[in-house]
Amino acid sequence: MAPGETEREAGPAKSALQKVRRATLVINLARGWQQWANENSTRQAQEPAGWLPGATQDLPHTPKEPGPRQHAPKPPSPKPDGDREGRGSEEATEVSHIKRKEVTRTVVSKAYERGGDVNYLSHRYEHDGGVSEAVQPDNDIDRILLSHDSPTRRRKCTNLVSELTKGWKVMEQEEPKWKSDSIDTEDSGYGGDMEERPEQDVAQVAAARIKRPLHSQANRYSETLNCKAHRKYSQVDNLKGRWQQWADEHIQSQKLNPFSDEFDYDLAMSTRLHKGDEGYGRPKEGSKTAERAKRAEEHIYREIMELCFVIRTMARHRRDGKIQVTFGELFDRYVRISDKVVGILMRARKHGLVHFEGEMLWQGKDDHVVITLLE
């Protein structure tokens, strides 16, 4: 038989063999999935209907070690029907190729952790009350008590401290208007006739002088000051005042805005700046326009410094120490960095950093113009 005829006959046989192998692999995979589904459904059916804390806990299953990799079996040879039925029962008991692994839960939510902290504290207070403080390990208790996990508690404490501080400052600044009802000023012994009184009167006056005001009056006065400070430094009043201030500023700005319906021509003309006034020709301080102008000035100044650095690195030095370069050479070098060569040169000359002849520079026409770096 010729070699060509052998190859032609082997081609269809090889393709048929590959088809049979693929079909067998798909059948085995489907059988494995079906077996896994049956086992999973059986295990779920055996589990309890509801969850009880600590009542039903499955024992940890040891993961099965995967066996050696099994290759796809060769296409079976035709056998009688009885053999097929026996083989089907044996294949049903084969171990599935799907790997399973038990996953244990290791992450506990924050709510459970806080509940555990509370239980731990109550247990320590109930059972370890008689133990001395030196023996108790206070690290865990201090960590729980001194922790600032709650932002609400932290915010309330901060507000309370600030209000109390402001109230006491106001109370220190204001002079007390109440008097001690223990003794009047006229009868306190202060005056010129102090020396003429007998020693008994002096002793009585000294004893009366060290008396303190009644607690009821002092408490009433401190409560009054605290109420005044609370009303004066209340958060609601502060928020209301800020909103009112913003509303007044907005109304005033709308009166000066020519594009607003509330524009007041007379007010705008009376408040406008004239030439020579401070702030004339500049944006209003604190506005967005002023911020953009500041950023633009910083950007232009940075580009001017870069231009001076390029001139300093590529130019030749004169005898007097100054650096010179022609406009054509600078244009060919700096145009790769920025296309604003002429504008930056004009700006640098305005600031006194460079000098060149003429009001404007043109490429090709003014390539011979000498640019001198002054600083």
UniProtKB/Swiss-Prot annotation:
Single biological process term from Gene Ontology: transcription by RNA polymerase II
Post-translational modification Phosphoserine, affected residues: 150, 182
Basic and acidic residues: bias regions: 80-101
Tissue specificity note: Predominantly expressed in heart and skeletal muscle, and expressed at lower levels in adrenal gland, brain, kidney, liver, and testis.
Signal sequence segment: none
Keyword Protein transport: yes
UniProt keyword annotations, A-Z: Actin-binding, Activator, Cytoplasm, Cytoskeleton, Phosphoprotein, Protein transport, Transcription, Transcription regulation, Translocation, Transport
Main localization category: cytoplasm
A GO term, aspect molecular function: actin binding
Transmembrane segments: none
Induction: Up-regulated within 1 hour in the left ventricle following the application of pressure overload by aortic banding.
Description of how the protein assembles with itself and partners: Binds F-actin and ABLIM1, ABLIM2 and ABLIM3. Interaction with ABLIM2 and ABLIM3 enhances activity.
PANTHER family listed in its UniProt record: ACTIN-BINDING RHO-ACTIVATING PROTEIN (PTHR22739:SF20), STRIATED MUSCLE ACTIVATOR OF RHO-DEPENDENT SIGNALING-RELATED (PTHR22739)
Role this protein plays: Acts as an activator of serum response factor (SRF)-dependent transcription possibly by inducing nuclear translocation of MKL1 or MKL2 and through a mechanism requiring Rho-actin signaling.
Name of the protein this chain belongs to: Actin-binding Rho-activating protein
Protein species of origin: Rattus norvegicus
